[in-house]
Amino acid sequence: MVDHQWTPLQKEVISGLSAGSVTTLVVHPLDLLKVRLQLSATSAQKAHYGPFMVIKEIIRSSANSGRSVTNELYRGLSINLFGNAIAWGVYFGLYGVTKELIYKSVAKPGETQLKGVGNDHKMNSLIYLSAGASSGLMTAILTNPIWVIKTRIMSTSKGAQGAYTSMYNGVQQLLRTDGFQGLWKGLVPALFGVSQGALYFAVYDTLKQRKLRRKRENGLDIHLTNLETIEITSLGKMVSVTLVYPFQLLKSNLQSFRANEQKFRLFPLIKLIIANDGFVGLYKGLSANLVRAIPSTCITFCVYENLKHRL
């Protein structure tokens, strides 16, 4: 029996899709916590809203609705799982193709390719940054409708008035109340937020190639250990998330139910948040996001690197 040989693009898509799915299953409750903290930034009544207040609210909603706390914590799992699997699969596929295209457009004639590693060993941070940005822009545009529905589902308890009961119900209600353009709410800050992924990949792949280069020079297996993956992932994510977090917060608020009720627009929304909490309001929920983002990205990239290595 002949082993199936996956193409580089297939490896990227399969590894990315699998990594996104596994990560979502593990950290979904933290994602829900992050969304609700971000949405509290536009509420004067919730100016001092923190993680424990969100948890108390979830427990209270659970008691009122008769649903278990676990069900409340995993509200919106289906669409989050679907969205992250699609987004990571598309992103990794596009990123792998795009960085090769950019490299080949600037490479000198006669540049060599090492067996099994593509041209990554010849690339620099600018190529990773450019590939990450262009791939992120395309992925953000393709998946924005999913994130609008996800944000609205996760921002409310199932028993709340007007809450979406499912993905299908969410699409129906959104099209009825907001029209087709409602599917693209929050796209502008989402496109600016693409810089987070681009910065992350610039840091991650640059550090990764340095480690692999040393392994290659010492005749070792050209593959990151899980500990090495966690090390460079944590550093890259901490830097990138902190720098562009306000765009994530703005996107979540523009995609929420409250955005439709109060007719939020980007610049008035920024003014409202600053009026409620000052400039620090643009970073509301950052600590919870880092607690979620760093472990989740470590899981994503450990699954991605290991699966890609074995395909």
From Swiss-Prot:
GO MF, one annotated term: FAD transmembrane transporter activity
Entry's Gene Ontology BP terms: FAD transport; transmembrane transport
Signal peptide: none
Transmembrane domains' residue ranges: 13-33, 77-97, 129-149, 183-203, 230-250, 266-286
Keyword field: Membrane, Mitochondrion, Mitochondrion inner membrane, Repeat, Transmembrane, Transmembrane helix, Transport
PROSITE patterns, per the entry: SOLCAR
Compartment(s) where it occurs, according to its Swiss-Prot or TrEMBL record: Mitochondrion inner membrane
Main location: mitochondrion
One Gene Ontology term, aspect cellular component: mitochondrion
InterPro entries from the UniProt entry: Mit_carrier, Mitochondrial_sb/sol_carrier, Mt_carrier_dom_sf, SLC25A32-like
Membrane association type: Multi-pass membrane protein
Recorded family membership: Belongs to the mitochondrial carrier (TC 2.A.29) family.
UniProt protein name: Mitochondrial FAD carrier protein FLX1
